[in-house]
Design a protein with these regions (language model features):
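Sec-dependent bacterial lipoprotein signal peptides
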Residues: 1-17
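N-terminal leader/targeting segments and the immediate start of mature chains
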Residues: 13-65, 185-195
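Short linear motifs in intrinsically disordered
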Residues: 33-37, 81-85, 129-131, 151-157
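Flexible, processing/modification-adjacent segments and terminal tails
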Residues: 36, 47, 93-148
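One face of beta-strands
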Residues: 41-47, 54-73, 82-84, 91, ...
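Hydrophobic lipid-interacting interfaces of membrane-associated proteins
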Residues: 48-52, 76-78, 98, 147, ...
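An acidic-aromatic
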Residues: 63-118, 172-174
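Gly/Pro-enriched, hydrophobic low-complexity segments
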Residues: 130-195
């Protein structure tokens, strides 16, 4: 009788976990479809980059439309206003005049400036490795490339990204706190003024 009850319990657990997996997969599919149809996307992020022997902090704005994307430094004040363009479907940065050498965090091009385009690319077409609920947020782990995994925390109600971790070489290299997320037909370009 114990074996029978144990077997039934295991089957129920597997069925229940499968239902939750479908829920996260559906949320992932809906998010990708929503971002694919959005004409524009903009947000601000406080980014913390973890180098081998130092930590660097930036406040960056991101804006994307049919012509591509743009990352602009809002802080630190010393480099505020430096921006880079990203062609549609790419994560390679093209600087407008000034080149900002923030240093790469891995051998595959991850840097503080490239982190936001890489995150957006993962949100659009990254494969979902896992999904769970944590502190009232929906969390998805997305495999962006063979080398990059993005873990993103969303508000459960509308799947708005709130924070993200970008992991490469087995460790988290970039932390991002996301605010002012706007998507749709024509969100305003982010305010590029600094305080």
């Amino acid at each position: 009788m114990k074996k029978f009850c144990l077997s039934i319990s295991l089957c129920l657990c597997l069925l229940m976990s499968g239902c939750g997996g479908r829920e996260f997969a559906k949320a992932r599919e809906d998010l990708a479809a929503r971002l694919e149809t959005a004409a524009c996307l903009s947000f601000t992020a406080n980014v913390r980059a973890e180098y081998e022997h130092k930590t660097a902090r930036f406040t960056l704005s991101y804006y994307e439309d049919a012509q591509g994307g743009k990352v602009t430094v809002l802080a630190p004040q010393l480099i505020a206003g430096v921006s880079a363009r990203i062609e549609p479907g790419s994560t390679s940065l093209e600087y407008d005049g000034v080149c900002l050498g923030t240093g790469e965090l891995d051998d595959f091009g991850l840097s503080p400036m490239s982190a936001l385009p890489m995150l957006v690319q993962a949100l659009k077409d990254g494969d979902m490795n896992a999904g769970w609920t944590e502190s009232g947020c929906t969390v998805l782990e997305l495999q962006s490339t063979d080398e990059l995994v993005c873990t993103v925390w969303f508000t459960s109600e509308d799947m708005t990204p709130r924070q993200a971790e970008l992991r490469s070489d087995g460790r988290v290299k970039v932390f991002a706190e996301i605010s002012d997320w706007q998507e749709g037909l024509a969100p305003a370009a982010p305010d590029e003024t600094t305080e």
